[in-house]
Amino acid sequence: MATANKTKGQKEELITALYCRLSVDDDNKDMESNSITNQKQILSDFARREGYRNTMYFVDDGISGTTFQREGFQKMQNMVENGLIGTIIVKDLSRFGREQVEMGRLTQIVYPSLGVTFISIQENVNTATKTGLEMMPFYNILLR
């Protein structure tokens, strides 16, 4: 099974998941930078610039990051578990979630074991690199 979906020599093209989330609480804090529309633009620009194709948006609007029982997230997670997604990209780690233990389990154990790369643009984290994988625990602690 292919584990990445960049344009270079890919035989089997896996989906690059572009995940967006906006909490009800976020609505009043920084509407412009955290809006779903803005997140989609940032994610699509990054994916295009870095050569990721076959992108698909997964969106949770008005859902807290303290739970992973979110419709868009669950759909993405099911596709990950079925081997359809090779990369997950988020604008920043807080968009992915705010629950430290589950975030760590997914980004440091589950995704690497399934060959899925996790990228957070703002924190410049890419778990396909040794440094990116090593930095994830520190970022998860900072999100508390």
Task: Please state what every model-predicted region is.
Residues 1-144:
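Short, structured surface patches at the beginning of a domain
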